[in-house]
Structure formats: structure tokens, C-alpha cells
């Protein structure tokens, strides 16, 4: 459904919402933790804790794997092992995807509100597109979205603004007519660079940093509590 007029989200008139996945819609920390701890023994490396993993989420699987290796190895050794490690990670992630994760409270209701208001919804994530679509389908959230674009969909990932600019172009809206809904400074930086507004979840990951230190038009404890005026 395409909005024939702007809908106010957090007081901002918009026609589209660009929504992050990990840490915003679904708590996927368990998936990342389980996958890494399947990967690491292949290289005789010890397991990592959830606390170590959460600090490294948000910039894509390549960053997550590279930084996890550096917990145990120096830069040179981590770089040398990385090509084999990322292949192993992707193989294990395909088997784990969705099995150790859960939809955050208020997300189905929040997506329903946004969709029913007439906003165009698109999911933009740094997760590979095939895994993003699989996860959304697994959690029964896929029907709300007109499109899903993963980290392999465009030449650059968030926090680069390119994915948001491309999403707006494909939706046929100006960036100023879209709001980014996410959980981290990566989402905020991408939105700022693209010229979109941003609303941020207080329950996400954000590299262990207080989210309210990142400028946004709104902060929300549940997606269904995000202010919406039709």
C-alpha cells in the first residue's frame, strides 16, 4: 500500500519507513553467538561470550568475524585466518539462522500499525539478503515489507548512506520523506548521510554504547509505542 499523503511518525511527515533487522525487529544475538561458537573450534580457538559478541554486532558478518578473531589473535594472524573463518561462519550461520533468536515485544503490532497507516515499508540490513529474507519469513514478519535489501544488495553497507538512498530511489520517495527505524549509531549515521530522519530503539545493541547519546527524532522502548499520527 502506498501512502497518498504523508503520515507523521514521531512528529515527522513521511511516506516510507526504512527498518533495520538485527536489534530492531529481532533479537539475533543468540544466532550470532551460536554461529561463532560453531566456527571457532574449527580453528582451535576458544568460545566467546554473549557479552563479547554484542559489542561487535551491527556492521555486517565480515566485521563480526574479523573482530571476533582479534579477541584471540593478533592482527596478522587474524587477517591470515579470515578467509577461511568467514566461509565457515557463513556455512554455520545458514544452519543456525533464526533458531536462537526471538522477535522483540511489540514488533508485530508496530509493523502492523505502520503498514495499516499506508506507509511503504522496506527492510535494510547488513545481513546477507538471503538470510534476512529467511529470518523474516521464519518470524512471520516478511508480509509487512515491500522489499528486503541485505548487505550484499548494494555496493556499500550501513553506516554508508547508499543503501538508504537506493531504497528511497526504488520506493520513489525523497530521502526527506523517509524515516530510518533502527537501534544503533550505524543506522543514525546512514540516515544522516542520506537526509532521512531516524528513530532509535532503546533495547538494541549499539556496540554497548548508550543509544540516547545518538541524535534522533525519537527513542522507543517498543516499536508499537513509536508515535504515529495518520
Annotate each PLM feature:
Residues 1-15, 112-115, 129, 133-230:
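Asp-based, Mg2+/Mn2+-dependent phosphohydrolase catalytic module
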Residues 2-5, 10-21, 25-109, 130:
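N-terminal helical cap/lid subdomain that shapes the substrate entry/recognition surface
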Residues 106-118:
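Catalytic-core regions built around general acid/base machinery
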Amino acid at each position: 500500500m502506498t501512502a497518498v499523503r504523508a503520515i507523521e511518525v514521531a512528529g515527522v511527515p513521511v511516506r516510507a519507513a526504512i527498518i533495520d533487522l538485527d536489534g530492531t525487529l529481532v533479537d539475533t544475538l543468540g544466532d550470532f553467538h551460536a554461529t561463532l561458537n560453531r566456527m571457532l573450534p574449527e580453528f582451535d580457538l576458544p568460545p566467546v561470550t554473549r557479552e563479547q559478541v554484542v559489542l561487535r554486532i551491527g556492521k555486517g558478518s565480515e566485521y563480526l568475524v574479523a573482530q571476533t578473531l582479534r579477541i584471540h589473535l593478533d592482527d596478522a594472524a587474524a587477517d591470515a585466518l579470515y578467509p577461511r573463518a568467514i566461509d565457515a561462519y557463513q556455512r554455520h550461520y545458514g544452519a543456525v539462522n533464526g533458531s536462537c533468536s526471538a522477535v522483540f515485544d511489540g514488533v508485530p503490532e508496530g509493523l502492523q500499525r505502520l503498514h495499516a497507516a499506508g506507509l511503504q515499508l522496506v527492510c535494510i540490513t547488513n545481513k546477507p539478503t538471503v538470510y534476512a529474507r529467511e529470518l523474516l519469513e521464519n518470524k512471520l514478519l516478511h508480509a509487512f515489507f515491500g522489499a528486503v535489501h541485505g548487505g550484499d544488495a548494494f555496493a556499500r553497507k550501513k553506516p554508508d548512506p547508499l543503501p538508504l538512498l537506493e531504497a528511497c530511489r526504488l520506493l520513489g520517495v525523497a530521502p526527506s520523506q523517509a524515516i530510518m527505524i533502527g537501534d544503533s549509531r550505524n543506522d543514525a549515521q546512514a540516515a544522516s548521510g542520506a537526509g532521512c530522519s531516524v528513530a532509535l530503539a532503546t533495547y538494541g545493541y549499539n556496540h554497548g554504547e548508550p543509544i540516547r547519546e545518538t541524535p534522533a527524532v525519537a527513542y522507543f522502548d517498543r516499536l508499537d509505542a513509536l508515535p504515529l499520527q495518520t
